[in-house]
Structures are given as C-alpha cells and as structure tokens.
C-alpha cells in the first residue's frame, strides 16, 4: 500500500530542486545542429561555422577541429599556423615547407596552361563573337584562336585548385569561364556547385542566389532518372542555401517558397528534418514583413504548422515546439516557456543569431494576437508574463500593439486591464463563429 501513497509536497519540492532549469549554455549545447549540418557541407563551408564556435566552445578543441578540417586543402600557410598553435611551436615541420613549394609550383603551372584562354576571354572583341551555343563557341575559338579542349578543361582544374587554396573570388571567375565553354555536363554541374560555394564564401549573395537556381535546374534535369541522386543533391542544396537565407533579404521569400515546394519539403521530411528549425524561424520572422503579402504569409504559417505536426516524432527543438504550443496545443504558458528557450538556441546558431531579435519580436506579436482573439478582458500583468516582459514593458508593448494593428481596444490603467471591443453577436452569429473556429482548428491541424 505504501508504494501507492502520493508523494508529499516536500518530496515534490526536493525533486524540483534536484532538476533546476537548464542554463542558456546547456540549452544551446543540447540543440546544437553542427554535427547534423557538417555531412551536407563542403569543408570550406564548414569553416565559418567553426569560426562562430570559437567564442562558445573550448578554443583548443576548435583550433584542432579547424586543423583536421583544412589539413588536406592547399591553404598551406594557414594550416601551418594552426599546427604551430596546436603544438605551441614557433617552427613547422619540413613537410609543410615542401607542400607550400609544391602548391606554388602547381599554381604557376596552371597559370601557364590557362593563360592563353583566359586572355582571350578577357578580350571584348572575342567575347562579342560568342553565342549561347557552346559547340559553336568552341569551334569558333578553335578555328580562329587555336583553343583546344584541354585548354578549356584547364580552366576547371585551375578553378578547383584556386578554391582549394582559399582564393574563392578567382575560383568563381575561372569556373564561370569554364562553364561558358564546356559541354561536359558532369564537369559543368561540378563547376556550378564550386561557383555557388565561392559566391557564398565571398558573401556575394546575389551571385549565390543565381547559382542556387542553376544548381536546382541541374538537379531536376541531369538527375531526372535518379531519384536517390536527386534526394541527396537536394539535401546538399538545402543546407548550402542556409547561407544566403538569413544574410540576404531578397533570398528569404525565394528560399521559403523553395523549401515548401513538394520536392523540397519531402526532402526535408525524409532526409533532414532539422531544417524545420530554419524554416520555422524564417516563417515566424516573416511576420514582420507580412504587410507585403498577408495571404502568402498565412499560407506559409499554415504549411509550417502542418509540417511541424507531422514531424513532431522525428524532430523537435524550442523553435518548432513554440509553433506546436501556440498553434497546435493552444498552450500559451508553454509557448512563452519555449520562446525563452528558442531565444537561447537562436543566439547560439550560426545561421540564426542575426535573426534572434526579430524572431522574439514576431513571436510575441503572434502570442498576443492569438491571446487577444480569444479573450474579452486581458490582465496586462498576465499577458506581460506570457510575453516574458515585466509589467511596465508589457504595458508599452500592448500600447504599441494596439496602435500598430489598429485593433478596437482600450486600456484601463486603473484596473491594469485591456478591454477588447469584440463586436456583439447574435446567438445565431455566435453559433456560426464557434463553428468557424472549430473548422479553423481542424484546418490548422490537417
């Protein structure tokens, strides 16, 4: 019988004390996606993520990780300096000196091999005679200027080598020149991925978005009869697209639409459900931009809710849990709790740190909008708590909300309440509205 006695208050309190709330650092570590992201990124694209970790993790471990990441590249001077830092030495082994000499010799050789064709492609008179037909272009250059297929391929090899050396701007130009002339579909596809990476690493976001579109088209056409290849390549493109997603405002709508398209949302659900974090963050922060197209935003939100509900058993974090609490469970207390955790996750995520403030702002708006829709009289202190604000901050927030959204409401400062002037309804209208509300919740949950 004793085993069935409910626990005392003291036992419950001591249990709570044994499990104190997690710190921001613990939450960030628990939901760190770096191990999930790395397999889908080129090693050069991983480097900025490790740089971001330098201020958060053990610096020695990060330095060692950078060394392991880049030791097989041709960034010889940088790798040598990492080795010196790891080994606390002022000198480097002879193997680094030898590799540096080999890299310089290869650079000189590639430059000589490609000098003729690069000079021709910088000549306006020559470029003016080029057309969209690659075969005709190559024939023209061969007949008029003695260009060979080996010379064209040297642009590809030289571009890849420059990329391996960390000269991303030069690599982008060489790979572009190669792509203009080559009819080798596999190499052209590889060059397009290389140019996308180069544009990302030089933060040329407009150019990166052009390459995202080219890679997407290549996946659809070149891998048309290879569903597994399409799945893998789409997974890579989704991860690479995260760089412009949150760094270039014009990319936001384009990539949100891409991620929600049938082929790509299926890829996310099948292969990389953790991308829901970034999709959710994009949709929530898009609330601040909703004036551009409110109906489009509502569709994004509805699509997000549907996917979060479907994938709840496969993946969740405080960002997706916030969506679940607010729009699936209609639990305002849980939504406020998850918003606090989400902020910690956002500030520790390389891609989302710059969107953290916008996310919190938009999320508070969404909580308050939902809360105001279902309450006639709102206690300012209670709503402030749900928004993670003190009473003074909450009061200012609500004043701004009423002003910005033009809702019909007034604040009773004496009582500390907001009175929502929902229009009076007939019994018939109340039945209709309740039916519509039930229908809305049903639609959201589908």
Swiss-Prot record:
One of its GO terms (molecular function) is translation initiation factor activity. Its main location: cytoplasm. It is found in: Cytoplasm. It comes from the Eukaryota. GO terms for biological process: formation of cytoplasmic translation initiation complex. One of its GO terms (cellular component) is eukaryotic 48S preinitiation complex. Pfam families: eIF3_N (PF09440), EIF3E_C (PF21357), PCI (PF01399). Residues 256-425 form the PCI domain. Keywords: Cytoplasm, Initiation factor, Protein biosynthesis. CDD domains: eIF3E. Belongs to the eIF-3 subunit E family. Component of the eukaryotic translation initiation factor 3 (eIF-3) complex. HAMAP family: eIF3e (MF_03004). Component of the eukaryotic translation initiation factor 3 (eIF-3) complex, which is involved in protein synthesis of a specialized repertoire of mRNAs and, together with other initiation factors, stimulates binding of mRNA and methionyl-tRNAi to the 40S ribosome. The eIF-3 complex specifically targets and initiates translation of a subset of mRNAs involved in cell proliferation. This is Eukaryotic translation initiation factor 3 subunit E.
């Amino acid at each position: 019988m004793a085993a069935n006695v409910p626990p005392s208050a003291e036992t419950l309190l001591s249990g709570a004390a044994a499990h104190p709330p997690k710190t921001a650092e613990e939450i960030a570590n628990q939901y760190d996606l770096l191990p999930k992201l790395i397999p889908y990124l080129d090693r050069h694209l991983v480097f900025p993520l490790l740089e971001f970790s330098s201020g958060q993790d053990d610096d020695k471990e990060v330095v060692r990780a950078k060394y392991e990441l880049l030791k097989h590249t041709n960034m010889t001077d940088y790798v040598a300096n990492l080795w010196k830092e790891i080994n606390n030495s002022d000198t480097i082994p002879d193997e680094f000196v030898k590799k540096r000499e080999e890299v310089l010799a290869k650079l000189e050789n590639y430059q000589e091999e490609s000098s003729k064709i690069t000079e021709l492609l910088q000549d306006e008179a020559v470029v003016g005679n080029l057309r969209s037909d690659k075969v005709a272009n190559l024939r023209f250059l061969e007949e008029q200027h003695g260009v060979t297929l080996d010379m064209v391929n040297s642009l590809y090899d030289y571009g890849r080598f420059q990329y391996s050396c960390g000269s991303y701007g030069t690599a982008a130009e060489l790979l572009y020149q190669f792509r203009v002339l080559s009819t080798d579909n596999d190499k052209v596809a590889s060059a397009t991925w290389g140019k996308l990476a180069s544009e990302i690493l030089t933060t040329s976001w407009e150019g990166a978005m052009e390459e995202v579109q080219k890679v997407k088209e290549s996946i659809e056409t070149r891998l048309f009869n290879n569903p597994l290849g399409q799945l893998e390549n789409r997974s890579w493109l989704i991860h690479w697209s995260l760089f412009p997603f949150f760094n270039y405002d014009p990319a936001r709508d384009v990539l949100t639409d891409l991620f929600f398209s049938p082929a790509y949302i299926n890829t996310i659900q099948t292969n990389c459900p953790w991308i829901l974090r970034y999709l959710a963050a994009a949709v929530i922060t898009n609330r601040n931009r909703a004036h551009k197209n409110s109906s489009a935003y509502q569709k994004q939100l509805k699509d997000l809710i549907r996917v979060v509900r479907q994938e709840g058993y496969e993946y969740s974090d405080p960002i997706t849990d916030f969506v679940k609490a607010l729009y699936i469970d209609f639990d305002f207390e849980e939504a406020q709790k998850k918003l606090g955790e989400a902020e910690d996750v956002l500030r520790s995520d390389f891609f989302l740190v710059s969107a953290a403030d916008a996310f919190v702002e938009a999320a508070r708006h969404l909580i308050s909008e939902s809360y105001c829709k279902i309450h006639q009289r709102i206690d300012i202190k209670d709503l402030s708590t749900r928004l993670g604000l003190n009473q003074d901050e909450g009061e200012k927030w609500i004043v701004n909300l009423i002003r910005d959204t033009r809702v019909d409401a007034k604040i009773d400062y004496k009582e500390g309440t907001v009175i929502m002037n929902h229009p009076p309804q007939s019994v018939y209208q109340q039945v209709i509205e309740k039916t519509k509300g039930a229908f809305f919740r049903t639609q959201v949950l589908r």
